[in-house]
Amino acid sequence: MKKIFLIFALFLYKPLLAEDLEITKWFNQESQQFLEIMNDTSVDKSDFNKYEKFVEQNFALKSIAYGLINEKVIEGNDQETLLKYQKAFKKYLIKTIDNLANTSVSGDIILKDIDLKDKVYIINSNIKDGKSSISLYWKVVKINNDYKIIDVIVENTSYFVTKKSEFTKILRKNRGNLKKLIEILEKF
């Protein structure tokens, strides 16, 4: 009976272990790529190709973009305006990463642990440069067998929560006018 229980337990545990190894491998690969992009001094800062590729490959762009605005705003706009918003948000995110690169992120990203809650991986890591350490959490989901970042939390400050608050304020000030938000994002 014990053997059957152990075999059954191992059978259930094996997929979880494989998933842990897969997300760990993804994180190590993408965090290394992130640091390489950030520390590449040969990259022309006006050329967003590397940043754009990284963002497209690793961020759940549509989910984040739509999550940052009220559902009524989404429902109140046509597809053309929503697509324009998605494109403006993508460029805004790329420029945000470019600005981060200009602050010269260096060191190593160290994986501390990974938790899974409600199908969202919460990856706890630190960026260490020898002198200091910055706490960095990544919220990641699996979409169509690809891992996608839905939020980055730096020193307990969520990018998603911060931007949602900013976008809500802009939309409220402009009576829910998504075109005005797009205009502001494009000026960034």
Q: In which residue ranges do the predicted regions lie?
A:
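Sec-dependent N-terminal signal peptides
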Residues: I4-Y13
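Boundary at the C-terminal end of the N-terminal hydrophobic targeting segment
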Residues: L16-D20
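Early exported N-terminus immediately downstream of N-terminal targeting peptides
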Residues: L21-L100
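Surface-exposed, polar/charged faces of alpha-helical domains
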Residues: E36, V43-S46, E80, S106, ...
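Surface-exposed, charged secondary-structure patches
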Residues: K95-I134, I184, F188
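Short beta-strand edge/turn micro-motifs at domain boundaries
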Residues: S133-V161
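Low-complexity, intrinsically disordered terminal/linker segments enriched in charged
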Residues: V154-F188
